[in-house]
């Protein structure tokens, strides 16, 4: 979309019958605001990337009428409406404390996480970009200390807070982007797999199953399939997920967080008694069934009527550096071939930074911030439904 808004001629090649039919179809539609990554030990790198992406969302996507997120002096505001990109479905964080207080590093991590989330909640988005947030500064010392002693003296199994994370209507968002792109001249070619890429003079040739395409520049956005066309090595993580029903209407979306990651679970509510449950990522497929059993059993302890409609394993593709187990950020890599780039998107929320950053890399300037948009319902046929939406539609 960001290329077409600038008047460039763009062709989108998709090997499947519909767009967005893999990762964004499978996962929770969880919009990260940095809350979850207050627990990640990476010098706040992921947290800053996430917050920077929200800055870019506000700066480069506010022309879309259904982009219903706005800045305020104290946090981000969501204007709830039926066609809005985002929902006031805020996600509760439940930090496990029972039998964990002897793990003082966990107690500190929780104390720090809660203080940072409160900082995100109170951030003045009107006057300061959030992506420039510094590491833990003196203003956080006292809140962290207070949280630390509060945790030590509580008898609760979990310490619960409402995070700043919320959910998205990903299909509405993607259809708006696609509709505007098509209005600006985008050509979409589905069921047409990329086979090989090469340079010829100043041109790039994309050899596809339905014929060759010739252009000036090429972005390869094929997830784990990028290994076929580049020297990049991808680490795949497996996420057991289930679509469930009989979720009481008063149930809030939540994630249970623990020092021992294997016990983490979550649920994202989808309305009309539907929800999605999951929690962790695995390295080995053989471990998935054991975790399915565990997370379903844990959810049924509080909701015995919970019914599992479908189980599946989502795949996450990441570029991992030495010493890392996970890497959540996006990567834009210049290939040896002239005018060819490969892109690994990272978290869905980071899409709003990938696009403007890619444009800056290619054209050495920022994309425009104000432009005409388009909303056409008939783009529904080009964008695949989510797994949970498909299950819901089948059941009526």
Across the structure, where does each feature detected by a protein language model lie?
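Dinucleotide-binding Rossmann-like beta1-alpha1 core, especially the glycine-rich loop
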Residues: 29-147
